[in-house]
């Protein structure tokens, strides 16, 4: 069974996002889901080639799995408790 840490360490490439969104995040040094959720949404406004469509795509993907920006370890634990079925499936 996967753990919250396993989910936190999922590669951003496993999120089924566009190549542009993935490349923009890689240029920001983001490689994992935990690194992504640790960022402020405003951080994405400064990135070259990161337009509104890419920002919306990333935000939508996070929201679809119950995640958000600026998550702390406590937020992740709360998420894990509420999304145990999702963790088991992924």
Task: Describe each PLM feature range.
Residues 1-90:
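Compact, charge-rich alpha-helical regulatory domains located at protein termini
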């Amino acid at each position: 069974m996967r753990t919250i840490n396993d989910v936190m360490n999922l590669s951003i490439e496993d999120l089924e996002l566009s190549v542009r969104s993935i490349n923009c995040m890689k240029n920001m040094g983001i490689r994992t889901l935990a690194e992504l959720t640790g960022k402020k949404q405003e951080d994405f406004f400064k990135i070259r080639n990161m337009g509104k469509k890419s920002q919306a795509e990333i935000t939508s993907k996070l929201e679809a799995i119950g995640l958000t920006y600026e998550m702390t370890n406590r937020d992740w634990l709360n998420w894990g408790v509420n999304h145990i079925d999702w963790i088991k499936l992924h």
